Amino acid sequence: MPELSVILPARNAAGTIARAVASTLAAMPADSELVVGNDSSSDSTVGEAIRGASRGGVVDPRLRIEDITPGEGGVSRVLTQLMERTDSRLVGRMDADDVSLKGRFKRTMRAIERGDDMVFTQMIELRGSRPVPRMPYEITPEDMGWHLLLTNPVCHPTMLATREIIDRVGGYRAVPAEDYDLWMRVASAGGRIRRLAAWGLLYRIHLGQVTGNKAWRSDSWKNPDQAQAF
């Protein structure tokens, strides 16, 4: 088994996934895999993912594509299936419309080896073609709990975590904010969560994002399971 599996949910992402795949493979160590979960895409998502992993007609063997079983649960369903189909010690995340920056995994893996359970990098927002860097300051495990009570201070597709901590708290759940719900349960279980100051991702901002929807935000706070984690 590889040391690291980076899981990437994708649905009709043909316009962006090639760059997401290429940049992530470029940032990943040799002993790793990038596992794309194709969630019933009706466009050329799979072909574009393969194109992003190809150099000189050769596909990077670290790319693996998994067809996701349809059903309810949204992205949490995809992530759960990808967790079940991988067995690496470390788990990373990536989204199909973002861009990984070089050095991302080297920095986060170093923090894991120093004793953290879950590590994030800071991000640079990509608003159209305009990059907007977020303030590059670190949040230590000692301070993370306070930050989580006030807001979600970390970006899911920058995550690197031990599989052990994710499994210990029950993995992803079918709630509106499956990422924040996981962070809260990890923190409550005594997990060490850190956000590094360094930028590790270009995070694309666009109108269609679910998290920017007011109805989603309302449903998120009303969900009883998520409220219990908080």
Placement of each model-derived feature along the sequence:
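Cell-envelope/extracellular polymer assembly enzymes that use nucleotide-activated donors
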Residues: 3-5, 33, 181
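Short, acidic, metal-binding catalytic loop of nucleotide-sugar glycosyltransferases
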Residues: 22-31
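Short beta-strand/loop segment that forms part of the nucleotide-sugar
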Residues: 31-40, 66-68, 96
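A conserved acidic beta->alpha catalytic loop
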Residues: 38-48, 72, 95
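Glycine-rich, basic loop-to-helix element that forms the pyrophosphate-binding segment
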Residues: 68-86
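Short aromatic/hydrophobic "clamp" motif used to bind/position activated sugar donors
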Residues: 91
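Conserved nucleotide-sugar donor-binding catalytic segment
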Residues: 143-220
